[in-house]
């Protein structure tokens, strides 16, 4: 279980996240919703320790994540994989090498420096790419891919980390509706097939309702809603977005979305087990 207790992050006199508290069961798909500037990205970055909390604690299975340093902190970042809005791929490198970067925390330093990837890691990376129909692009430069393809590569990279948690920060913000569905289905797949907890920042309430088990709503850095998607009423939407409910609930501009979970190849379970 992931437990957040009174988590606060201040930049000067401004609290980007203010006294956030919640607990998340293993295997959940959590949507963090709210308008721009609500503190969603800062919250996810604190969970991974890319941003340092000013106050509060993060506990995972009894471990105080906020106290980790050095090697233990690097291990935590491997266990809590980040997926960014802008993909964070190395454009000049091929797709397979970008995915293999997710294995760096599992390798000795000399292998990392030489990029001497073990054959089992290469097989793991190819298996991850195959989950998202990206294996045919393994030898292609990452900067030659479309935005949706790059995001699928980023998800494959996160998967080969063999994480306990995937933290996805606005993964569909720059994607068209078709690629939005492909990427959200990919996140749902790693959640349902591999039992990995997914915490995903989303602007789209429609998508949040369809894909997520639970929603955490933020406004001005504070958690103002925590519940099932069915509990997200028009009144709550107005509080979260400071807009008329009709504007919020109808602003996604996506056709109705139905999640798709294609069957996995039998060998794909290697991604989960190593």
From Swiss-Prot:
It is found in: Cell inner membrane. GO terms for cellular component: plasma membrane. Its main location: membrane. ATP binds at residues 34-41. It catalyses: phosphonate(out) + ATP + H2O = phosphonate(in) + ADP + phosphate + H(+). It is a peripheral membrane protein. It is an enzyme of class 7 (translocase). Residues 2-245 form the ABC transporter domain. Belongs to the ABC transporter superfamily. Phosphonates importer (TC 3.A.1.9.1) family. The complex is composed of two ATP-binding proteins (PhnC), two transmembrane proteins (PhnE) and a solute-binding protein (PhnD). Part of the ABC transporter complex PhnCDE involved in phosphonates import. Responsible for energy coupling to the transport system. This is Phosphonates import ATP-binding protein PhnC 2. The gene is phnC2.
